[in-house]
């Protein structure tokens, strides 16, 4: 995999650093923002950030063709580092505007790394490469949760954002030296709307998009509302939440590489069905857990992520098997499932939270919704893989 491919090693390191930065801040963003906007307006900030991200992602393939992958990555990561520094320093509501810019920039860096993995990996070993890449970036999430819970028990949110800035500064340095003299592929010259038409005319890409959208919706609800439920409703401390989330994320490190390797030989259909079944059942079980016990919540959330880890790697492998390295516009569309989810999930949650009798009903609704993924996965045929 890495033999004679030093650029791929650099990309994996960059993926690790980016994920470390994201993991340090993702689970505290909602609590941090609520201090400036009020708890009720946090969803609105996420919606605005996501809509702006979708608008920018629409033009990214054209920007990439003009700038080249290397320069695009340096500019977007440099601006991300700057925005994180400002977030760590600002103490006024203006920090919300900087957060929105940072939110958009993170998606640009994620897109750039996705494109780089596609360029420097061979299609025949796509499952192995994607599985290992996901394991590496999710290792960063585990380590960050282990550290951030302890950090928050001693310092404030601003400290974590400053640590995230330092990580992105390192990212910029490694990107500058590690990807020098890279050669871009000949990108498709397709207009924005036409790329959407081509994407959604392909049943395999549409199916991959729908599966990933459902997974991203799951992530958004979990990222925004699980910390709130554990902290505000069940009385867990941030140190306890850090331990819970560290254990919760272990499946992403332990099983994604073997699963990716396995998918190269077997295919994705059966594993996707299994993943959605496990994620749905485990999420439904959260509705019934009302005790303040770290080990119970750690085990329950660990189970939800076993399903999510299976879905994530199989969805990515299935998608990337059906595109070529020059199809950068398709990657932009596929990755917009995350900002789309950050629009849909808070809107749905706003309606749901005004109708349900208690907060824990969100897990009952989310678990039921994940059952639809079993049907989606069952529509994959052997000829589609």
Segments (PLM) and residue ranges:
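Cytoplasmic helix-loop-helix junction between adjacent transmembrane helices
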Residues: 103-137
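Juxtamembrane intracellular "pre-TM" segments in multi-pass secondary transporters
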Residues: 1-8, 180-211
